[in-house]
Design a protein with these regions (language model features):
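Membrane-water interface at the C-terminal end of transmembrane alpha helices
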Residues: 108-129
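Membrane-helix boundary connector in multi-pass membrane proteins
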Residues: 85-102
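Membrane-embedded alpha-helical segments of multi-pass transporters/permeases
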Residues: 22, 59, 88, 112-116
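Cytosolic, membrane-interface loops and tails of multi-pass inner-membrane proteins
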Residues: 29-35, 126-133
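Membrane-helix boundary elements
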Residues: 3-6, 14-41
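Juxtamembrane helix-break-helix junctions at the cytosolic face
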Residues: 57-70, 91-92
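Core segments of alpha-helical transmembrane spans in multipass integral membrane proteins
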Residues: 16-20, 40-62, 75-85
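Residues within membrane-spanning alpha-helices of integral membrane proteins
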Residues: 7, 11, 48, 73, ...
Length: 133
């Protein structure tokens, strides 16, 4: 595993989550224990497009960041950490629950750890191009 792969995993997961939020909005929100309304579906679909966009940015960052990839890895780790903080807040206040919330929490913690670990590697040990894999 390398930092480029972590970016691809993060990007892929965000694109899949975004697609589910965009095309199966009611099911996704309902599985998190939310009361689905037409207004919430609109917000959920907006989240879906945003998640797809973040996934695309993450996927492409590993190709275009070059030697700055570790710095971007730290930034994306912080982005994922913000999502974890929000999930924990929603759990504590009872605004969301159910298996999807816990799955997102565990996956998010793993991603933060991977971004942190691989961003801390020596620049010489970070695989940046496909030729080096």
């Amino acid at each position: 595993m390398n930092l480029k792969l972590v970016f691809r995993i993060f990007g892929g997961l965000n694109m899949v989550t975004g697609a589910v939020a965009l095309f199966a909005t009611s099911e996704m929100l309902g599985s998190a224990g939310m009361t689905v309304t037409p207004q919430l579906i609109t917000v959920g679909q907006g989240f879906g497009v945003t998640a797809i966009a973040l996934g695309l940015v993450s996927w492409r960052t590993s190709d275009i960041a070059g030697e700055s990839l570790p710095a971007y890895g730290q930034l994306f780790g912080i982005v994922q950490l913000l999502q974890i903080v929000l999930i924990v807040y929603h759990l504590m206040t009872g605004q969301a629950g159910g298996p999807p919330v816990y799955i997102n929490l565990v996956v998010g913690i793993v991603l933060v750890a991977l971004f942190y670990f691989y961003s801390q590697q020596d620049d010489n040990s970070v695989i940046i191009s496909d030729d080096e894999e």
